[in-house]
Swiss-Prot record:
Encoding gene, per UniProt annotation: mraY
GO-annotated biological processes: cell division; cell wall organization; peptidoglycan biosynthetic process; regulation of cell shape
Family, as annotated: Belongs to the glycosyltransferase 4 family. MraY subfamily.
Cofactor(s) needed by this chain: Mg(2+)
Enzyme class at the top of the EC tree: transferase
Protein name as it appears in the record: Phospho-N-acetylmuramoyl-pentapeptide-transferase
Amino acid sequence: MLYSLLYGYFNINLFQYLTFRAGLGFFIAFFLTLFLMPKFILWAKAKKANQPISSFVPSHQNKKDTPTMGGIVFVFATIVASVLCASLGNLYVLLGMIVLVGFSFVGFKDDYTKINQQNNAGMSVKMKFGMLFVLSLVVSVLLSLKGLDTFLYAPFLKNPLFEMPTILAVGFWVLVFLSTSNAVNLTDGLDGLASVPSIFTLLSLSIFVYVAGNAEFSKYLLYPKVIDVGELFVISLALVGSLFGFLWYNCNPASVFMGDSGSLALGGFIAYNAIVSHNEILLVLMGLIFVVETLSVILQVGSYKTRKKRLFLMAPIHHHFEQKGWAENKVIVRFWIISMLSNLVALLSLKVR
């Protein structure tokens, strides 16, 4: 909106620069989240929209009165900042906002069900995955119709591994959406544990998106160019800004939880960025914490069903370390460090090709 008004009509050149608009979006989203979150917390407490705490984690029972669904606020702030600072005529921008709002809506439905039932079950698995599947499929098909190429790239290699047939690419993208959104959802179990790794991953992906959308940088770095995708940089920075605003209230001890309203939206948007910037494989490294958390659940369930034995004291793995006696803050900060290092290694792939 501001972009169209100030650059399109008044020809204010500052607004033609992607980096300026992304920076402006960051601060708008940050301060808007900072302003709205206390009001949301008061409203949520009045409505008793508290996070149900699992009886299997007795050390977390002191969190039972903490309101949830804070993700609604940072998603809203991101959308407002994006509408103001991004070009709304760009399909990548529109699809990015659809992903954020759509995945957040599914998360909201799940959160609402948990609050009403006062347990952690939420929606049925069939309903939840069905909604996520349809949303992922629609966005993937639209990306295909947009003309996003279907080459599969591996990190540190300048040439693609191979070109996927369209139907295979769409199926693969749907898998990336579903796996990433649920991986972030599983990670969101301690104060700030999902927020900071999401920030690191989004910052890394935003750099890749910026390079992919810039003809000079993509040519110099031998990176696959994706026409018009650079505008997504604005939304990514806005989401990072809103996450910093959310973290202000979510750091230990948390005043609010993001809930599925936030974690599914984050995972969906991270997946979207990875797909449009051809980083589906590299996402495993950038989102290493999310991958490890998910694998710990898969291995735990698989081991128990096949051998009647548990590999971990509790899954996801952050609870395993809590059960071993690690303080919550120690688990959180160490996971942050791992996430930061994995993203720094991922960024090296930009130059090493």
